[in-house]
């Protein structure tokens, strides 16, 4: 633990604690904070001025990052007949129906994203209690309940990121890897923020974004200019 703390203390010296960074400066800074033995993820944290206890203030959706996430995503699809064929042709890793649900019931879930056609959501409901806590339950708002399974598979493979505000009004997301170019990270982060702004509830009052920061998996965070964040449309 001491070694980790010393490493973290060294990284803290590279961050001006009281400074508000614009997005360009923030990306430059976090790229200098890479210190782990793996390719760290660039993460964003947003504190929104919403109350998710009210249905009309829930912020939830998905967005495809232009430069991808840098991760290999395994996609499973619950579909039958022609839709199953479409999913396979689109590159889905696992395609099934009753057999796939049985595997899930046994705890066999070798996938990162689950897509289902609307007519089979009754079947998916049998394993809702297993999928829900893992964040794998298909949902129309994230484009994972759809008849266009080919597009959904393509989105997932291309770098789709799902977001959902938590009970405290926070949203966290990984938006690429530290070895991405500055341009790739800027494009990904800007695209994500625009999606968050697009989903601003009509009933939200005051400043929509209260706090925003950027960090790596194992680094301190840098504070983003919330006005610049809110101005990204």
UniProtKB/Swiss-Prot annotation:
Annotated gene: rplA
NCBIfam families cross-referenced by the UniProt entry: rplA_bact (TIGR01169)
Cleavable signal peptide: none
Single GO cellular component term: cytosolic large ribosomal subunit
Pfam families (UniProt xref): Ribosomal_L1
Lineage, top ranks: Bacteria, Pseudomonadati, Campylobacterota, Epsilonproteobacteria, Campylobacterales
Domain of life: Bacteria
UniProt similarity note: Belongs to the universal ribosomal protein uL1 family.
GO MF assignments: rRNA binding; structural constituent of ribosome; tRNA binding
Protein name: Large ribosomal subunit protein uL1
Function: Binds directly to 23S rRNA. The L1 stalk is quite mobile in the ribosome, and is involved in E site tRNA release.
Assembly and oligomerization: Part of the 50S ribosomal subunit.
Keywords assigned by UniProt, alphabetized: Repressor, Ribonucleoprotein, Ribosomal protein, RNA-binding, rRNA-binding, Translation regulation, tRNA-binding
Record keyword RNA-binding present: yes
PROSITE patterns in the record: RIBOSOMAL_L1
């Amino acid at each position: 633990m001491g070694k980790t703390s010393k490493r973290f203390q060294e990284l803290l010296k590279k961050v001006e604690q009281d400074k508000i960074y614009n997005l360009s400066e923030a990306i430059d800074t976090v790229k200098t904070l890479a210190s782990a033995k793996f390719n760290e993820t660039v993460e964003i944290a947003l504190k929104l001025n919403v109350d998710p206890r009210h249905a009309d203030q829930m912020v939830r959706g998905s967005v495809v990052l232009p430069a991808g996430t840098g991760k290999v995503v395994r996609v499973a699809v619950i579909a039958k007949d022609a839709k199953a064929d479409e999913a396979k042709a689109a590159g889905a890793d696992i395609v099934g129906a009753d057999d796939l649900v049985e595997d899930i019931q046994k705890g066999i879930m070798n996938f990162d994203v689950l897509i289902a056609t609307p007519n089979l959501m009754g079947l998916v409901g049998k394993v809702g209690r297993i999928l829900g806590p893992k964040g794998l339950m298909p949902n129309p708002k994230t484009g994972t309940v759809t008849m266009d399974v080919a597009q959904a598979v393509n989105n997932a493979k291309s770098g789709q990121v799902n977001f959902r505000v938590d009970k405290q009004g926070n949203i966290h997301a990984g938006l690429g890897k530290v070895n991405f170019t500055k341009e790739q990270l800027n494009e990904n982060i800007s695209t994500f923020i625009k999606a968050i702004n697009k989903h601003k509830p009509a009933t939200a009052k005051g400043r929509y974004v209260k706090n925003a920061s950027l960090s790596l998996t194992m680094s301190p965070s840098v504070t983003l200019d919330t006005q610049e964040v809110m101005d990204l449309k």
